[in-house]
Design a protein with these regions (language model features):
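Short, well-ordered loop/turn sites that connect or cap secondary structure elements
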Residues: 99-100, 159, 243
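Glycine-rich phosphate-binding loop and adjacent beta-alpha segment
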Residues: 230-297, 329-336
Length: 336
């Protein structure tokens, strides 16, 4: 089979299309003929892991060395990137009960990665579910990551109808999911983004949109129950004046300083910092599938690239001008 492989850390050009061995499912595994995957922040940072600046390492610094060892100090241990996928089950192990050959599925591999390949072999208990009936493979492949991350945080703070939510970084994968989920839960949502993306964020359902190049939301007298800072580029000290008395500052990352702030604000009470990573389950994907089929969550695709142009897809993502998700399609016409 064909896969997008990288054997050294570096720029997008390290991604190469190569022939690799097709996996064989074990008794409790399913073999998925993969049709689409995506480009996420995790793919970019993992590909360039050896050279990633400390300021962009979204984990506590004591975890830097163990993480480097896990991923590979000098070269990648896992040569195939990609965490999101959508495809069709081609073969099932003899003990598989949840799926059948021919089922159309989508899912999330998290840090295991491996979705930049024509075939994926995973346990039936992994983060995989039947694909939403109203989405094609490309649309389904870009849903899991952002929605799972946003859902994890919003559940953690028990979001309530009528609450005021601000999403800073509203046009990316997690931000666009956070807006749609907050609206589903009945919140009043404000999205913060740059000038070219204002209409895009409005189209997601945001009640208000702030252009950060013209207005600083922290300088306003407006206050919010929840402020969702997607990659933690702001700060709690800067944003806490914009939080209501018991408001929460939400982060989809957990640097050491943020963890200390989370612990301290939990002890102190009042305004709180909440850091969370998604310990997602297949049940979450089933819930997401239901939201998609009910029209509450839509897939936002900016560009789609064939697997031969994976480097170009990564380069475009790194430019930071995408609105929504970047897709990589996996052609099977000439597979081996």
């Amino acid at each position: 089979m064909k896969a997008i492989v990288y054997t050294k850390y570096g720029p997008p050009e390290v991604l190469q299309l190569k022939e690799v061995e097709k996996p064989t499912p074990k008794d409790n595994e399913i073999l998925i003929k993969n049709h689409a995957t995506s480009v996420n922040y995790g793919d970019i940072s993992t590909r360039n892991f050896k050279n990633i600046p400390l300021r962009d390492f979204h984990m506590p610094l004591p975890l830097l060395l163990p993480t480097r060892i896990a991923f590979g100090l000098r070269k990648p241990r896992k040569r195939i990137l990609g965490s999101e996928f959508a495809g069709e089950i081609e073969e099932v192990g003899k003990n598989v009960k949840l799926f059948e050959k021919g089922d159309q599925v989508f899912g999330y591999l998290s840090m295991n990665m491996g979705a930049y390949a024509q075939y994926i072999c995973i346990s039936e208990d992994a983060r995989v579910a039947t694909k939403p009936a109203n989405m094609n493979y490309e649309e389904a492949a870009v849903v899991p990551y952002g929605v799972i991350m946003a859902l994890s945080l919003l559940r953690k703070v028990n979001i309530q109808p009528g609450q005021k939510v601000l999403v800073n970084g509203a046009s990316g994968g997690i931000g666009s999911a956070a807006i749609q989920l907050a609206k589903y839960y009945g919140a009043e949502v404000t999205g913060v983004c740059g000038t070219p993306r204002l209409e895009f964020v409005r189209s997601l359902g945001a009640d208000q949109v702030i252009d950060y190049t013209r207005e600083d939301f922290t300088a306003s007298s407006e206050t919010y129950d929840l402020i969702f800072d997607i990659l933690g580029k702001g700060s709690f000290s800067r944003c806490k004046g914009s939080l209501k008395e018991n408001g929460c500052y939400l982060l989809a990352s957990f640097k050491m300083k943020k963890l200390f702030q989370m612990l301290w604000t939990k002890i102190r009470g009042g305004k709180r910092v909440i850091c969370a990573l998604a310990f997602d389950k297949s049940e979450d994907l089933i819930f997401i599938k239901e939201l998609v089929e009910a029209g509450k969550i839509k897939s936002i695709i900016d560009r789609s690239y064939p697997m031969e142009q994976a480097a170009e897809a990564h380069r475009y993502y790194e430019e930071g001008q995408h609105r929504g998700k970047v897709v990589i399609t996996l052609d099977h016409n000439n597979k081996t």
